[in-house]
Design a protein with these regions (language model features):
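Divalent metal-dependent catalytic cores for phosphoryl transfer on phosphate-bearing substrates
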Residues: 38-45, 51, 56-178
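Ordered, soluble secondary-structure elements with a strong preference for glycine-centered loop motifs
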Residues: 49, 93-96, 196-203
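Low-complexity, glycine/alanine/valine/leucine- and proline-rich hydrophobic stretches
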Residues: 159, 165-219
Length: 224
């Protein structure tokens, strides 16, 4: 299958049809305020903040381009955006198990400007950005009604792919486009350098996506 055509970079606010993962200045200001509320001043946390912004932009593109496939509404798009921003705040207490720490911080830190209706969902999404899939062996996930479990799995699968596309935290992946085929989803990315680590990671972390949507996942780099 041919790779989908990449969108040109936006030099001004992007229309709805543009797939370039660029955030508006005002949005970045709001997002920075959100994350710095819990992030101590350190190189590690500064990197996590920048990485979170990139992952949020990529996740927004995936959410938009895959809308017909996932069928989630804008409420879930907003939750995904917040979770992408905050998924690595657990690094504030160390790398080991940081996904679970991120969940706890999102749940407990009321300085984060998250609506209380969204907070538990954002926390769960951050928890499932890595390691174990959402599972009914987990009490919090099991307590959800079936439709909510299904929606959370879908959103978590997108977050894991978005995170993988900035695996090296270098911003090597720029614009991307998604094509949905009958048995396959193709993600075409524009890379500014070697993105082999990202390509490999997408397939590894895309296992939940392939399970949830029953489609093979392919990621191709089209260069600059």
């Amino acid at each position: 299958d041919p790779a989908p055509a990449l969108s040109a970079p936006c030099s001004e606010p992007c229309p709805e049809t543009c797939s370039a993962p660029a955030a508006e200045t005002a949005e970045l200001a709001e997002e920075t305020s959100l994350t710095t509320a819990v992030m101590p001043e350190s190189p590690v946390m500064a990197d996590s903040l920048t990485h979170g912004q990139r992952v949020a932009a990529i996740a927004a593109t995936l959410f938009q381009d895959l809308a017909e496939l996932h069928g989630l509404d804008d409420v879930w798009g907003h939750r995904l955006h917040l979770a992408a921003q905050l998924h690595d705040i657990g690094f504030a207490e160390g790398r080991k198990g940081h996904h679970k720490i991120s969940m706890r911080l999102i749940e407990e830190d009321l300085s984060l400007n998250i609506h209380e209706d969204d907070r538990p969902w954002v926390a769960l999404l951050a928890r499932y950005h890595r390691k174990a899939w959402p599972s009914r062996r987990h009490a919090r996930f099991d307590a959800l009604k079936k439709s909510d479990r299904k929606a959370l799995r879908k959103a978590a699968s997108l977050l894991r792919i978005a995170d993988a596309l900035d695996y090296t935290h270098t911003g090597v992946v720029g614009n991307l486009a998604v094509a949905v085929k009958k048995r396959k989803v193709i993600i075409a990315v524009q890379c500014s350098g070697d993105c082999s680590a990202e390509m490999e990671r997408v397939i590894k972390k895309g296992d939940l996506f392939m399970h949830v949507f029953g489609r093979e996942l392919e990621c191709v780099c089209q260069g600059n």
